[in-house]
């Protein structure tokens, strides 16, 4: 018999190549000679310990940590202490009014990016603060307060829109309207 008829294995060009794919290599393929092999978990342990010590260090009290409002702690405010007391909410609204007055210089320099960031930061918690601060007011003044608060929210959203475009005249116009409406809200809370 010929060798062509008795072969049990197929020819090499018909064989399917077997690819073994490693998902995670246990060590780096390229390494320098003379240096010890780096443990795979070294970076993870370092990062975990850094985050742990940062959180523990952040738990200590300082002047900024005692302050219950401000731009430095907006992540903490939004996710870890969303519900302030009505007095704290009123104080944060007053501080927002002062911050909006200080924003004039950013508008004069036309640094729109910072203005947008500041407006959106304040808008994020202002509606909740306005609702919380309403509990301080007597029933007879609440309707007027709600109208002033709605006007403030509307003016801030218009200011945000015109700063995004950026239209200079309209931005200044709604900036002044926002200042006027936040002053009306602060009058109710005083």
Curated annotation (Swiss-Prot):
It comes from the Eukaryota. It is a peripheral membrane protein. It is found in: Plastid, Chloroplast thylakoid membrane. Disruption phenotype: Impaired chloroplastic NAD(P)H dehydrogenase (NDH) activity leading to the loss of post-illumination increases in Chl fluorescence, probably due to a reduced stability of the NDH complex. GO terms for molecular function: calcium ion binding; electron transporter, transferring electrons within the cyclic electron transport pathway of photosynthesis activity. NDH shuttles electrons from NAD(P)H:plastoquinone, via FMN and iron-sulfur (Fe-S) centers, to quinones in the photosynthetic chain and possibly in a chloroplast respiratory chain. The immediate electron acceptor for the enzyme in this species is believed to be plastoquinone. Couples the redox reaction to proton translocation, and thus conserves the redox energy in a proton gradient. Required for both formation and activity of the chloroplast NAD(P)H dehydrogenase (NDH) complex. Belongs to the PsbQ family. This is Photosynthetic NDH subunit of lumenal location 2, chloroplastic. It comes from Arabidopsis thaliana (Mouse-ear cress).
């Amino acid at each position: 018999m010929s060798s062509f008829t008795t072969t049990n294995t197929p020819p090499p060009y018909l064989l399917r190549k077997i690819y073994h794919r490693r998902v995670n290599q246990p060590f780096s393929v390229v390494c320098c000679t003379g240096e010890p092999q780096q443990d795979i978990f070294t970076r993870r342990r370092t990062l975990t310990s850094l985050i742990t010590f940062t959180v523990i260090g952040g738990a200590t009290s300082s002047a900024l940590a005692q302050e219950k409002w401000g731009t430095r702690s907006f992540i903490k405010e939004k996710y870890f202490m969303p519900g302030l007391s009505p007095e704290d909410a009123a104080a944060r609204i007053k501080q927002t009014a002062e911050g909006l007055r200080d924003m004039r210089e950013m508008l004069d320099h036309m640094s729109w990016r910072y203005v947008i960031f500041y407006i959106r930061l304040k808008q994020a918690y202002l509606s909740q603060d306005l609702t919380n601060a309403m509990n301080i007011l007597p029933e007879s003044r609440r309707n007027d307060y709600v109208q002033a608060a709605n006007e403030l929210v509307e003016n801030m959203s218009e200011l945000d829109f015109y700063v995004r475009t950026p239209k200079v005249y309209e931005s200044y116009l709604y900036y002044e309207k926002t200042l006027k409406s936040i002053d009306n809200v602060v009058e109710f809370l005083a």
